[in-house]
Regions:
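Juxtamembrane extracytoplasmic segments of single-/few-pass membrane proteins
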Residues: 1-42
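Short amphipathic alpha-helices in soluble, non-transmembrane regions
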Residues: 22-29, 53-65
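Helix N-cap motif at beta-to-alpha junctions
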Residues: 15-18, 48-54
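Conserved short beta-strand edge segments in small beta-sheet-based binding/regulatory domains
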Residues: 34-37, 64-74
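A generic structural motif
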Residues: 41-49
């Protein structure tokens, strides 16, 4: 197989975000939690192969009711 690039985002959710809202968010953006929460409440999310991680990160940044920060991990 060719280059195996991982499409990971590092995300912190707002402390008042509900499990249901987060599950809906993950489903809508086709994201899978691969790690977390860390001590700093950071999660690593995997972006599906057919999506651009940068575009997904931008979309998540607009979800201000649920998301505190989003970084694209390389």
């Amino acid at each position: 197989s060719g280059q195996n690039t991982t499409n990971l985002l590092t995300v912190s959710f707002r402390s008042d975000a509900t499990q249901g809202a987060l599950a809906d968010l993950l489903m809508r953006h086709q994201l899978v939690i691969v790690d977390g929460p860390s001590a700093l409440r950071l999660y690593r999310l995997e972006v599906s192969k057919d999506q651009d991680p940068v575009a997904v990160a931008l979309a998540l940044r607009r979800e201000t009711g649920l998301i505190e920060s989003v970084e694209v991990s390389r």
